[in-house]
UniProtKB/Swiss-Prot annotation:
This is tRNA (guanine-N(1)-)-methyltransferase. Specifically methylates guanosine-37 in various tRNAs. It comes from the Bacteria. One of its GO terms (cellular component) is cytosol. Belongs to the RNA methyltransferase TrmD family. One of its GO terms (biological process) is tRNA N1-guanine methylation. S-adenosyl-L-methionine binds at G110, I130, G131, D132, Y133, V134, L135. GO terms for molecular function: tRNA (guanine(37)-N1)-methyltransferase activity. The gene is trmD. InterPro entries: Alpha/beta_knot_MTases, tRNA_m1G_MeTrfase_C_sf, tRNA_m1G_MeTrfase_TrmD, tRNA_m1G_MTases_N, tRNA_MeTrfase_TRMD/TRM10. Keywords: Cytoplasm, Methyltransferase, S-adenosyl-L-methionine, Transferase, tRNA processing. It comes from Macrococcus caseolyticus (strain JCSC5402) (Macrococcoides caseolyticum). It is found in: Cytoplasm.
Length: 240
């Protein structure tokens, strides 16, 4: 996969040169490139923003730098051009899984008040948001999405490492424990020490249901509950 970032602050993406992202690049699994669209301003002052027509607060990113920078990137008809925008579709694990199947992504990371609408209308295939809040720029959102996407590409990490992640199964992840089995009187559940894999899997599934019920009950509306699941959830409701 190739990922390009249109940004005014390329140095912010240095954080992707560590850990799993670094190894994925070294293995040739993903290629990350930053493009400073100020270099494509097309004017002697390298101006990339201007006052909004009709008045209003803040500055708006001009179309020329973004269009020029996009023209300088090698693209195909399948390239997904993603606008970082608080108005966008919520970025979820399912969206990450979809984008992980693509060959080329371009993230447009804005600053200032917003984008000239012609950028949105004529260049963008997707508008995505990481939450109902506003950041000073799109870089942090793009970095967050990149981490979520790249770890899903085969060979980035061990496949089984992400299969049980929260949201990958439709439920939140079960509690995890490691040694020691007893730390200052705080003990690991006996079932995890039993060696009975059937009982362990049953416990983990119940814990997924319990955590989802307690923290994200909205997810249960779309999860295919078995009769046993429904009975367990009714038990949780009675004990609440």
């Amino acid at each position: 996969m190739k990922i390009d970032y249109l940004t005014l602050f390329p140095e912010m993406f240095d954080v992707l040169n560590h850990s799993i992202m670094k190894r994925a690049q070294e293995k040739g699994i993903v290629e990350l490139n930053t493009v400073n669209f100020r270099d494509y301003s097309g004017n002697k002052h390298n101006q990339v923003d201007d006052y909004p027509y009709g008045g209003g607060q803040g500055m708006v990113l001009k179309p020329e730098p973004i269009f020029n920078a996009m023209n300088a990137i090698d693209k195909t008809s399948k390239t997904r051009v993603i606008l970082m925008c608080p108005q966008g579709k919520p970025f979820t694990q399912q969206v990450a899984e979809s984008l992980a199947q693509e060959e080329h992504l371009v993230f447009i990371c804005g600053h200032y008040e917003g984008y000239d609408e012609r950028i949105r209308e004529h260049l963008v295939t997707d508008e995505l948001s990481i939450g109902d809040y506003v950041l000073t720029g799109g870089e942090l959102a793009a970095i967050t999405m990149t981490d979520a996407i790249v770890r899903l590409i085969p060979e980035s990490i061990k496949e089984e490492s992400h299969l049980d992640d929260s949201f990958s199964t439709g439920l939140l992840e079960y509690p995890q424990y490691t040694r020691p089995a007893d730390y200052n009187g705080m003990k690991v559940p006996d079932v995890l020490l039993s060696g009975n894999h059937k009982h362990i899997e049953s416990w983990r599934h119940e814990m997924r249901l319990k955590r989802t019920f307690e923290r994200r009950p909205d997810l249960l509306e779309h999860y295919p509950l078995t009769q046993s699941d429904k009975e367990y959830l009714e038990h949780l409701k009675r004990d609440k």
